[in-house]
Amino acid sequence: MGAEMGAEQPETIAAIVAAHRAGTLTPAQTLARSYQRIRDHNDPAVFISLRDEKDAIAEAEKLAARADAASLPLYGVPVAVKDNIDALGFPTTAACPAFSYTPTHDSTAVERLRAAGAIIIGKTNLDQFATGLVGVRSPYGIPKNSIREDLIPGGSSSGSATAVGAGLVPLTLGTDTAGSGRVPAMLNNIVGLKPSLGMISTAGLVPACRTLDCISVFALTVDDAALALSVMAGPDQADPFSRDRPLGAITPFPATLRLGVPRNGQLIFFGDRKAEAAYGEALKRWTALGATLVEFDLEPFYETARLLYEGPWVAERYLVIKNLLASAPDSIHPVTREITAAGARLTAADTFSALYRLQGLRKIAERTFANIDALVLPTAQTAYTTAQVLANPIELNSRLGTYTNFVNLLDLCGLAVPASMRADGVPFGITLLAPAGRDALLASIGRVFHADTKLTVGAKGVAQPALTPPATGGIDEIPIAVVGAHLSGMALNGELKALNGKLIEATRTAADYKLYALPTTPPKPGMLRVEAGKGSAIELEIWSLSSSAFGKFVNAIPAPMAIGTIRLADGRSVKGFLVEPAVLGEARDITAYGGWRKYMAEAATA
């Protein structure tokens, strides 16, 4: 059940979940395949902790027995997690044995993955304390690059990226403070999604720079990465840096798209002519797809990048390990120790001076994006061998951050996408960057670009799946989810029809909602999102209204009803009916019915 299974086996999340739902493959078989591939890959440096196979398969079998299993967006998908993110059943080491601890609960991101049907199989290697873009700074070894073994795997999320690239699992979590979710994606020919700051909770993450940290996603396709993001996205009271941002939906490739490219002479490739040529070919591809390329001044972005390690943000890294630096300095990788120790020497004056300059640079970035939808840059300017990096660890690592270090300081979202495979067997990728909140736009255009390259995914030589057109409504139409009397054939459905509403589909929520019957006359339902694992999937319908009709409809909704964001079983998000929690004291929990229609049918016969 190893690599010889070839292209006929489902490799992407979408294909694996579809096979589980169809019954052509069981979650237990998928887990067994992952473990066999791990054995065949024979690289002990990928995982710091690996779950016992029998235990993981037992969980897969238990999951498959659930009545709602098929509705879960990540039904039976094996997932690995970077070992600076807490996951129950595994120690968290941050690649430093002296720092290791046993978490008492899942990080919020892992909790949401499990609730969506994912099965966590292990914790992956990283540059110690997530400090580095190279993947060689770990006492647990250097993971093999999945494309060319002489190349660095990229970091700091080295194990997570190589695990996806090698086909061991279709989804992993990384982190991204300075490029750790993007550089290793390029070097392993996979997709790396760095969401907007605060979109995925960092509760349960060992910080690198707490104000800049993101949990990131590695996957084989943009659609897979976007699905994983939709499962994890959302505010979290446990994370003071969490932000409640609409995720948005993947849309068709826009009719007009303006992409920013640096002015002539501003790009730096450090003499790598093949990378420079590959970037030029990528720009030609964007033009052929219909994008307009607009030059912008990259120098303010370079200046911002220099602030990350030359400015006070290195003090955040120092705060994480200052006690360990004092008590057991030899337990810290020498390069990591050298970088972080500098944080102790920074002053408050240094900090405020840098913050003032950063604010000015942010204003420049805002003006840049005033007439540009997104930037398109090389993910990294070259690819180094492990031998080169070990001989010159700090300078070459710094070079790899040329196009990544400024991103979180400027509050941008990013999507790293494979662009080409060079003649020398080195993968090349581009990164799309946009202001926070434009994650869906990047996914919408990035998926089309990746598909157009016709590249195989990862290192397995498997073709990309056919690109599925995103669901579309009419121009100026807004989808809305209804769960009660507005359902087809029920008492208030006429309100939607009177506004020329159109039924799009009948589906279910993700499995983290409860449904209540409110003590009103006539009876009304109230749906509420609850803690992961404590709810169920609720039946609903999605209708489409024009924006003006949507406004009229929402304006007429009486308290305690409200419109909020609802996660669907397939991972999408849509606006729909929710209830204010304060009125649920005397309400009846009717979640077990699975929907309002079934509850009302039984009530009518009582």
Where are these regions (language model features)?
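A short helix-breaking turn/cap at a secondary-structure junction
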Residues: 194-277, 281, 300, 444-472
